[in-house]
Structures are given as structure tokens and as C-alpha cells.
A protein has these predicted regions:
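Pyridoxal 5′-phosphate
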Residues: 1-428
Length: 428
């Protein structure tokens, strides 16, 4: 028995967590921000945490860790229709998006200095938008954010026109597979067709899509795809960028070159093991999950609208694999500040979101809703309820019971435009 095993064997253990007690446990409706880890992923990760070995080392412990990494790479690739050599491990979705956007821009521009344009959409996650803005400011990139319709769906004809204006100057196209705020699924086949007709590579942020809708990298024709573990029931701090083998990328950071010489850093074998297990299970269960979660989502929307008749749902109303993510319910509540509603619901033990958790706390209206044509007041008056593998009918019941009084209280407090002290007063 090694020192760690001895410590674990004799350390006092707390009692295992009990089953849900609805009176005290929170109702978690924020799966789009992060979904609870699957028990199988926890077990896979825990099994490796008690083992020592750098995957880059040549001794037996290192080779064992390397075997875990490579087997995990193969499992993830098989689950999403990719080749193992195409899976580049990263620290998560944000790093993957940065590597895709910056790395591809630099590589393509180095090949041909005319390639300075990047085409994307106005509803991307900030993990794509912010690197684009950085490239525009520091590298002279010509970033063009293409319009979307009132459902947040890309105008493919606008993309076609932008490409045909001068396709030889476009370094890349980046369009998210599914929107993280309103759940709208983009017409990725059309995007790939338009871009590839001019030899332009396409990146997609599929963080919200993997495990929710069918994702097949090879069949999609995409060149780069971002995914992350904590959105599919895996651990935080690990993700991947899937890159076609023939595509060149410039690295963001330099060091050991562990991942195809485009990503350096010691690989986290335990987290990668948990990641692989989560991806496998999420993809395997996707079809059954879709039907169950769609039904719960539709029930939630119908009953919330019955409680608050002037509320409105944002995004594509159809729950289908080519229209909207199954667990996304994004609603505008007129006369209420979204942050205020969030705090009032949180005080009742219900967790939801006003949008992307990565930008939560920033007092700005949703850029996604603004791009969809909503005004600032509407963009500030919305909540996202996102359902996932732990969601039950009792969770929906709890929200439906709370939403009417919460909206009434928020409106009575007169909090529109002043979420800060007024929201805290309403919540208290």
C-alpha cells in the first residue's frame, strides 16, 4: 500500500450524500453553464487520481498514464466521428476556441498574406468573439460578424455574399453549432458548403451540441470542432479541439509540444479519463435524453407561460435536432430585470441563468438577444432555464410554483434598469 492509499484507507470518511430532499436541495436548471458529473465519469477520474505518472515520461508509470490518454483519445474520437489523431486535448472550451481562431488565422495568413478576413456571427460565445476582437485590434484582422434572424439563426445568404465578395481574402469561418443562450441550432451543412466552395476552413464551437444532438465530425465536413468535458457530465478544466490532420495551426503557447506541436503542457490523465467516459455516455444516451428532456422543456415552457401570460420564449420554438437544443428554455419577462429574477429564484433554491455563465455579473444586455432584434429592455429581462440529465418533473414543478410570485414581486419592486440594490431588496 503506498502513502496515498494508506491515507485514503485510514482517513475518516463522511457519510455518503443522501438522495434528493426537495425541501432543502437546490433545483438545478443551469445545465448549459455546467452539468453535474456523471457517476461513471467520477469513478473513471478517481481511479486515475490515485496513480502517479506523467504521460510524457518513458518509464512504466509514464507509459501507463500515456495509455490512459491515448485510449481516451480513441474513445472520444469514436464517439464524435473523428480520427484519434484529430483530437487535441486542451484545458477546455475557451482554450480550444482561442487555439482554433487565432491558430488558424495565423497559419492561413502566413501561407497567404491576403488572408486577413474572418467571418463569424454576432451571437457567438465570448470565447470566440473576444479572440476575434483581439485579432482585429492587435493583428489587423478584418472581422465580419454576420447577421442572424429573430430566432438567432445565421443568414446563410449573407455568408455567401461575404465569401463571394473576395473568397481569397478569408482566413476562416467560425460559426457555433448551437447557441448557448437561446439554444438555436445553426445550419452547419450550409455553412460548410458555402465556405468549402472557396477553399475556406470552418470552425464550430460545439460545446453545447455534443451529447445533446447528433454530432459526427467526419460527416459534417467541418475542419475544427470545439468540445469540453463539463458540459457533457465530465470534469472541469479539460476539453478538446478536433482538427483535421492536414490542417496547419500556429500554437498559442510554446513548450513540450505534447499535442501535435500545437498545444503544450503536461496532460491531465485523470481528467481526460473522466472526459472520455462522459463523452461516450452522453453520445450513447443522446437520443433517449433528447426525447425525455424535450418533453420536460415543453412542459416547463407551457406551464411558465400559463403562470406569466405576457412572458415570451426566445429562439426557435421547435424542439428538434436541427432547430433547438432539447433542454433550453429562454424566456423574456416584461417589466422585470433578469438579474433580479435570478436572485429571487435563487433565494427559493432554484438555479438558472441570465445567459452565458462566462459573462455573468457583467451589467450588459445580452448580445445574443440584441443581435436577434430585441431592444435593451427585453435583453435585460430574460432568463435561461437549461435542463439536463439530473432534471426531474419535480424540478419543473418547483419552478412553476415559484415563477408567478417571483415575477409579481420583481415587478412590484420596480427593479427594471436597477438590478443592484433594488434586486437585493426584493430578494430580501
Amino acid at each position: 500500500m503506498n502513502d496515498l492509499s494508506r491515507t485514503l484507507a485510514f482517513a475518516p470518511m463522511s457519510s455518503p450524500p443522501s438522495a434528493r430532499a426537495p425541501a432543502t436541495d437546490p433545483v438545478y436548471l443551469d445545465h448549459a453553464a455546467s452539468t453535474p458529473m456523471l457517476a461513471e465519469a467520477v469513478a473513471a477520474m478517481t481511479e486515475q487520481l490515485v496513480r502517479t505518472g506523467n504521460p510524457s515520461s518513458l518509464h512504466a508509470s509514464g507509459r501507463a498514464a500515456r495509455r490512459v490518454v491515448e485510449e481516451s483519445r480513441e474513445r472520444i474520437a469514436a464517439a464524435i466521428g473523428a480520427r484519434p489523431a484529430e483530437v487535441v486535448f486542451t484545458s477546455g472550451g475557451t482554450e480550444s476556441d482561442n487555439l482554433a481562431v487565432k491558430g488558424l488565422f495565423w497559419a492561413r495568413r502566413d501561407e497567404d498574406p491576403r488572408r486577413t478576413r474572418i467571418l463569424s456571427t454576432a451571437v457567438e460565445h465570448h470565447a470566440v468573439l473576444d479572440p476575434l476582437h483581439w485579432l482585429a485590434e492587435h493583428e489587423g484582422a478584418g472581422v465580419e460578424l454576420l447577421p442572424v434572424d429573430s430566432l438567432a439563426r445565421l443568414d446563410v445568404e449573407a455568408l455567401r455574399a461575404a465569401v463571394e465578395r473576395d473568397g481569397s481574402s478569408v482566413a476562416l469561418v467560425s460559426v457555433m453549432w448551437a447557441n448557448n443562450e437561446v439554444g438555436t441550432i445553426q445550419p452547419m451543412a450550409d455553412v460548410v458548403e458555402v465556405a468549402h466552395a472557396h477553399g475556406i476552413p470552418v470552425h464550430t464551437d460545439a460545446v453545447q451540441a455534443v451529447g445533446q444532438v447528433p454530432v459526427d465530425f467526419a460527416a459534417s465536413g467541418l475542419d475544427l470542432l470545439t468540445l469540453t468535458a463539463h458540459k457533457v457530465g465530465g470534469p472541469y478544466g479539460v476539453g478538446a479541439l478536433v482538427v483535421r490532420r492536414e490542417l496547419a495551426l500556429a500554437p498559442l503557447q510554446h513548450g513540450g509540444g505534447q499535442e501535435r506541436d500545437v498545444r503544450s503542457g503536461t496532460l491531465d490523465a485523470p481528467a481526460i479519463a473522466g472526459f472520455a467516459t462522459a463523452v461516450e455516455l452522453a453520445v450513447k444516451r443522446q437520443a433517449k435524453h433528447f426525447d425525455r428532456i424535450c418533453a420536460l422543456r415543453n412542459d416547463l415552457v407551457e406551464r411558465v407561460l400559463a403562470q406569466v401570460p405576457d412572458a415570451a420564449m426566445n429562439g426557435d420554438p421547435l424542439c428538434a435536432v436541427d432547430h433547438r437544443l432539447p433542454g433550453n428554455a429562454h424566456l423574456t419577462f416584461p417589466g422585470c430585470e433578469g438579474d433580479s429574477l435570478l436572485m429571487l429564484l435563487d433565494a427559493r433554491g432554484i438555479a438558472c441563468s441570465t445567459g452565458s455563465a462566462c459573462s455573468a455579473g457583467v451589467p450588459q444586455p445580452s448580445h445574443v438577444l440584441l443581435a436577434m432584434g430585441r431592444d435593451e429592455e427585453q435583453a435585460r429581462s430574460s432568463l435561461r432555464f437549461s435542463l439536463g440529465h439530473t432534471t426531474t418533473t419535480s424540478d419543473v414543478d418547483a419552478l412553476v410554483e415559484a415563477i408567478g410570485p417571483v415575477v409579481e414581486r420583481a415587478r412590484a419592486a420596480g427593479v427594471v434598469g436597477g438590478a443592484g440594490s433594488a434586486a437585493r431588496k426584493a430578494a430580501g
